[in-house]
Amino acid sequence: MGIKVSSKIKRILASTGYIPIFIFKYRYYFYFFYCKFARKFVTKKIIILKLSSIGTASGSSNPKDGADVDVREEYANAFRTESYNHFWTRVVQLSRKKSAVSSSSSSPPIESSSTSARLMSYRLFAHNLLDPDLNTITRILDVSRVGRHTRTLLSDYFLETANAFLLCTQLLKNIHHLRSKYESLKPKFHSENHNSLALIDQFTEISKWFDPFISSGSRIQLIRSGCLYLLKRLESRRDKTRAKLKLINGLTHSSGLLVLALTTTLIVTIASHAFALFLAAPTLLASQFKPAGLRNKLTKTAARLDVAAKGTYILSRDLDTISRLVTRINDEVNHVRAMAEFWVGRGSGRVRGSEEVARELKRCEESFSEELDELEEHIYLCFMTINRARNLLVKEILDSDDPPNCSFAPKSKKKL
């Protein structure tokens, strides 16, 4: 399939000048064969690269190493970036317990695949890590040249992020208490010689520790709804500011044509002795259509509102994810607690009930621990996101042609 052209025919066509016509006439055939050849070449190249990578991996490692790859560890390593290490350093510095600081500094780098082993440190510090704090934010907004409406919106943004930060801190405390109580109960379920009646009573009592954790779901939704309302206000104000800026830019560009037309008309209609005045008219009139100060102010305001809107949107998505994780844990806890309450109500079947509850706890033990670790790690990443967004907005507020001379301005840091 295809068209073969001999060298003799090519020479004849070349002598007559028909090669361009021939190529144009059969251009689709040339394109078809070119694509077919390119696809075969790329496929062959990919196969060769895969075979070479497999050969290299098999030659440098044992066959058992492929089966021992820990996906959770690889996922965790993806988050150990420069911002992760920077935040971890701040965790150690802000810890009030010197023993914890010394032990964390003397311990080797974190290599465990368990998420709980990596996240033991920040349970002591969360309320100290909000950056910048509310007092600093208040002073920055007071000395900055921000409009009244914009200042109100930015102040509400910092307040909402602070509330979300405090909520995440409370969630961490609840997770810590929940894990400690669960760990104290777990060996008794694994023991073969346990008191079945006391076991169910103890689990029923410990299940009350889940109530503050369960009630936090409504608070998450409340803060998230506040973030969504604030996001609408920020976007509305930003769009209005951009519309004003676009209008001013349009007037600025059209003022040149307007002045030129007006000057030409005046030159034609007025006597020549006023010609010098007409030459100065474009400069005088153009100055009325170039509000450079207002344009710069609107540009900075739009940029600040845009940064705040992006930070609010990301925070709302993080809170939505945290809410889903909390709901998933609540469903599993309610399932086990309902089973325990069912066997408690049976009375005579409490011995069998303890066995059923113990069996159910063994079944969901691993998934329950992983869910707590996943929630804890996402809260930790939410801390970093909140601080990064707040610092970006503060930098945008202080970044101007004549920045205020304030000693509390954030120092230059590495970009998170």
Swiss-Prot record:
Family matches, as InterPro entries: DUF677 (IPR007749)
GO cellular component: membrane
Annotated membrane topology: Single-pass membrane protein
Localization terms from the record: Membrane
Record flagged with keyword Transit peptide: no
Spans through the membrane: 266-286
The keyword Transmembrane appears for this protein: yes
Main location: membrane
Keywords: Membrane, Transmembrane, Transmembrane helix
UniProt family annotation: Belongs to the UPF0496 family.
Record protein name field: UPF0496 protein At3g49070
Organism, scientific name: Arabidopsis thaliana (Mouse-ear cress)
